[in-house]
């Protein structure tokens, strides 16, 4: 087999990264976007010792699970890897692959959306100048080239409206000082726009146009970033209009959301996810709970409505200050947050009676030391919320070595049209 050779193939399997699997003379070939059962003409683009990669040249026999692409940049933008699949098939596809990861553990049916479009509450648009024209949109897959577009079909309609307005009004002079434009639209109908770049001088007039056009813009910020790497946000900023935060809402609690703070991008499914986490804890109202990796306190505040007390632990001081502001705003006297390293906190509280620990770590999951810290407090139950099924699977094995087994995993489709998936895992002590 050589590069640029063409073959007629039939897809026999798929991977969790959206590649079809075909075999040519006992050589496995991975073909992006090819569905099981499809027949296609492909071209080989890379050959390794034991496997190769191909691309579809012509689809000869499409699957009944394939749908027409409705997005004008779906083939070039790296955002939506699964848009060619019907939504029902996306759920089946994700469920199949997540079930493989958790052998011997019950995996409950995946919870999807009624409408899997226009759901995201946050967008980051890179800004570049090419051939004397401003480019705004999304990065091409595996590239720093910008794919321009009129709208994004998984972004909230209001975000698309603000994005379209900025595209029409931005000048070359404005764009030369920018790296990104960041737009948020909250479930309370507040809009935040953050310009990221080296100088705000040329952006002030655009800021004025935005606030005069969109009545529900409550925050416009310029974030200074002169770095030469891929980090989006810089350390310093200036408020051009309103506040440096917007008000969000989750399960009845208001959340003061600073533009640097993490918040789930799918508000409807976030409530499904956190409701499943609370359900897994099986709370009676008498429990003492810990919210590890607490961030701005969203999970802990939701839990506090069903528990006796909640302590949130977070190492970032600004996030802790925000979380405590949020508890005051929602009159949650039995929920508070501390700024402390997780190891120190665990050892300070190892003699306390902790009923449930909620964990929501970043994509890389937990370290073994982090897992040891968690079980130092000997909770009756652990509820692990994960945005990466692979690191969750790894961590559940380590928890089992230290005496906690997983009863079940509940997948939630938070990132429709993409390969992303959230999961809630319920762990209990091995008796």
Would you name each region that the model predicts?
Residues 1-69, 73, 336-337:
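Terminal RNA-binding accessory module
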Residues 2-8, 14-18, 172, 201-431:
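Rossmann-like S-adenosyl-L-methionine
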Residues 20-25, 137-141, 323:
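Short, acidic/hydrophobic/Gly-rich beta-strand patch recurrent on exposed beta strands
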Residues 57-69, 75-176:
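Extended interfacial segments that mediate partner engagement and assembly in macromolecular machines
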Residues 109-116, 179-184, 410-414:
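Short, solvent-exposed loop/turn elements at beta->coil junctions and helix N-caps
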Residues 117-121, 187-190, 419-422:
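A short, glycine/Asx- and small/polar-enriched loop/turn
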Residues 146-179, 185-187, 199-221:
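Internal alpha/beta scaffold segment
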Residues 189-198, 254-258:
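Short, aliphatic-rich beta-strand segments
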